[in-house]
Every structure is written in C-alpha cells, then in structure tokens.
Amino acid sequence: MRKLFIIAILMAATTVVHAKCRNVFVEMGYQPAQVDAKLKEVFNDVFRGPNKVYFEVGDSMGYVSDIKNHDARTEGMSYGMMIAVQFGEKDIFDRLWRWSKKYMQHQSGNREGYFAWSCKTDGTRNAEGAASDGELYFITALIFASNRWGDNTGINYKAEAQHILNCIQPKEYTPEPRPAGFPSFGPQQQGPQKMYLIDPETKLITFTPDGFGNRYTDPSYHIPAFYEVWAKWADDGRADLWKECAQKSREFLHKATHPVTGLNADMCQYDGSEMQMPRWPGMPQPKPGEKPRRNGSNNFRYDSWRVPMNITLDYEWSGADAEWQRGYGERIQNFFYSQGVDKFVDQYRPDGSLPEENEILQAGGFRKLRHSIGLVSTVAAASIMCKHAKSKEFVDALWNAKHEPFEDGYFDAYYDGLLRLFAFMHLSGNYREIIPHK
C-alpha cells in the first residue's frame, strides 16, 4: 500500500497537460504507433541526428545553432527550450537556459533582462540588442518549466520568467553611440529614448524593444495564447494587461492577413498596413519619374511562414477567436492549394503574386524561390483549424516530405527543421498548454 501511495505521489508531481489537443495524424488514418515513431524521428533529427542543430557544452550547457549562419540565436534557443519542456527533456531545457543566461542575457545596464539576439557559438555576442520574439518564447517556456518541474530542482524557473517580465516594462534610456556602417537601421538616435517589448499605446509586440525596431511589428511575433499563459501563471500582477495584449494581437492579425489569400507581410505597421521604404541620409534616392523600390519586408517570406502555426496554437489553446481562425486556415490553405500542394514556393506578395527578383530574400547565400519544408510544415499545421477535405493533402505532404539538401546544395537544418518539428508536435497532439503539477 505504501508503495502504491509513493507511486501516486510521483505521478501527481508530473505534469498534467491540456486535454483539448487532437491527434490529427490519427484522425486522418495514420496508426498511433506510426505517429509516435515519426515524432521521435523528427525530434532526433533536430537534437541527436547527423544533421542536429543542438550541441552540448561541458557538463551543464548547450546551444541551438543556425548552422548556415554560424551563430546561436534567441529564436532557436527559446524554441529549443519550448520543445524540451513539451517533451519533458529537463536536461536539454536546463542546458539551453544556462547558456542563454550566461551569454545572451544582459545582467545589468539599459538592457538588463533582455537577450542579445545573436551570438557566436562560443558565446561571443554578434549584437547587443534583442529580437522581441526571443523574450516571448523564453518567458513562456520558463513558466511551463515551472508548471512541469517546480522551482526547487536547481533553477527557479518562475523567478527567471518574472525577472524578464519586470525588465520588459516601458522605460527611458539614453542610447550609447552606435558604430557607423548600419544606415538601414536609421540615423543615430539622440536624447532619451523608450524601450519596451510591448508597445504601450497599441499593446502589440515590437520588432525590437529599442531603436527603430520598436516603431513597428512582425506578424509572426504575435502569439496571443502565450499572453494567456502569462495571465494564468506568471503571477506578476499584470494578468489584465496580458489578457488585453492577447486580444489586441488577435485583432491585429485580422488586419495583417490578406482577406483572400491569408498571406501576411514579414513586417508591418501597428495598424497592419505596409511598411514604407525608409530613405536615410546618404542612401540612394529615387530618380525623377522612377518608381520607388518595393520594400521586400512587405512580402510573405521566412518570418511569415510562422503565422499559420501561431494562429493554430491560439486556436488550440484558447479558442477565443475560433470562427475567424477557421476561416483564416481555410483561406491560406486554399491559396497554397491553388499553387499546387507539392509546388508552392516560399515567398509571395500578400496578394498572391510572385515577388520581383530584387524582393526575394536570400538565405544561405542563395537568392531563390523554393518549395521549403518549413512552409510545408506550417501550412500543414493549419489543418487543425480547417474542415475542408484539402487539409489531408497538406498533412500527407508533410508526412511524406524529406528534409534533405536541395539539388544546388542548399540545406537548412535549423529553421526548416524546427518548424517541421513544431508541426509534427501540433498534428500529433503533443504541443500543449502545460498546467501546474499538483
């Protein structure tokens, strides 16, 4: 009897997860054992296989690397932590957090609590500033770690999340002189400036917390369900604010996605409108009568791929905007279906037309449109929101897609690999809201 009681206590100390998540693969005819094996295979591709992007450092740290760019980014580090907590991989989670805290997180100064968005794999910073989606994922992953493992196993996860939440509140700072050579980021700012993760007027997430980047946003940074997690379990006294941020993000996504294609721009204004091409002093000006060059960030491209999956996440975890989200899911799948389930490319203008050559964002030294598995993954994940029969074709396409180099040698183990893993987690019912253990 005592043994059974101890087992019951141990079971209670493990996490209970949200019960709503469906196993769409099984619903569409795949066998549960097949799905479990495939999910394990895709996880191992990212963390343990020959093309892995996760690397351990010593006895206690590790990092996720964007291999093709030879760096570690807050994007990948925080994604890795979110994946680790979902899979119950505490050692991986703790290693990634220790590396992030040691090398990326500012421990003092104007940016205290924020994370340098890019570091060399030895920890040397490539940049000091933050990219706001990293903080978004770090906070949420830490809260889930607290909910899953408690705060007495070596890291006080909730305290770490609360520290970041306190540091991202609006504040004034005086910018340090900036090195020359970065005209695309605007002129040097003078005098007191504002820093914040969430724009205090619109309640929308910034592209970057400071500098020119806090004047606009990135639609792929909008994950309303994460704010709901903060409201429930951050215990930082700001629950009403986070609920408001969730609602404002949902309203923003209505504006930022095309009413016919469902596509969105990589970056846009807080009202969902297009970015205007900045013309800083010293940059070439258009000649008289010359049509201004289109700002390529107004196109659907790499960052944008994440939006279908982010909206899917909110649909699954919250359901607060389910009717619109179902319509969105079918709109965007209808568009890609019209392009060919096995043929659609990875960059478009929001109206569905193809970008001109100079608008195509290069990756890995190639300026080329591709049928990328990262986008295949996120469009397939949107099937969770959809009722039409087309969804099965997208799910089957993801299941059968091979993550391997293109004929010209291009291969993205990092971004494509992580989005592929997230999609398999979603469609197998294994990307869930983690509630506190009892």
Where are these regions (language model features)?
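Sec-dependent N-terminal signal peptides
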Residues: L4-A13
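Short glycine/serine- and small hydrophobic-enriched flexible loop segments
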Residues: M81-G88, Y137-R148, A225-K232, M309-E316, ...
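Solenoid-repeat scaffolds in large eukaryotic assemblies
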Residues: G80, I92-F93, G154, A161, ...
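Aromatic-rich carbohydrate-recognition surfaces in CAZymes
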Residues: H70-M77, T124-W149
